[in-house]
Amino acid sequence: MRTLIGLLVAVALAVPGQADAAQWGLSGEVGVARFGGTSRDSSGATLGPYRPTTFGLRVDRELGAVRVGIGVLYARTGLAGEQDQTAVVFYDRASLVEAAPEISITVARFGAGVVTRVAGGPSLDIWDVDGASRTRIGARGAVALEWPLSGRCTGSLRATGVLSGSVMNRDETPAGVGRRATRRGGVAIELRYRL
């Protein structure tokens, strides 16, 4: 992880380009997330995090069509047991702090400054479930639609997907319950300020 962060910083500082093309940016986002996987028993019942509101901050460096950055995300979530369209939710049982370096690339430009970007990178997820901390490494991908709001501000709608190890530890699942990779999908509205 340290090697990847070092590589991203080196690329951000070393990629040649026009002097005025390299821009730093600071973003804030608010979103919602939906989880899948985590643990499942033989009857099909699942247990996992349940639909939190997410808050994120990201600092990045834009080099033409490429943007390199690192983001931090926070979510406070409940744990839910779900089966046959029914959920039993235990609120405020877990929290997630995620650090995610990423590289994004512009894939399409539309009139009036609207841009579509794709992004990807690793994620480091630190979960606190009922006071017990656990760390998971995952992969993260995103698609964003950005539009200008003013000279220095852009807004965006961002869809993100993350795949990581199960939130549950081996000793937390009873017999007959299997741990599964945790999948997270999310949608967020973001405001970016060009520094």
Name each model-derived stretch.
Residues 47-50, 58-63, 140, 181:
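Short secondary-structure boundary/capping segments within folded domains
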Residues 56-137, 149, 185-194:
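Gram-negative (and chloroplast) outer-membrane scaffold detector with strong preference
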Residues 33-55, 134:
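Surface-exposed strand-loop-strand hairpins of Gram-negative outer-membrane beta-barrel proteins
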Residues 31-37, 75-79, 123-129, 162-168:
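Structural signature of outer-membrane beta-barrel domains
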Residues 41-46, 84-92, 134-138, 172-178:
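Flexible, surface-exposed loop regions and adjacent strand-edge segments
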Residues 1-24:
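Cleavable N-terminal export/targeting peptides
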Residues 45, 79-80, 141-195:
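Predominantly the C-terminal beta-signal and adjacent terminal strand-loop region
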Residues 22-34, 116-118:
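Transmembrane beta-strand segments of Gram-negative outer membrane beta-barrel proteins
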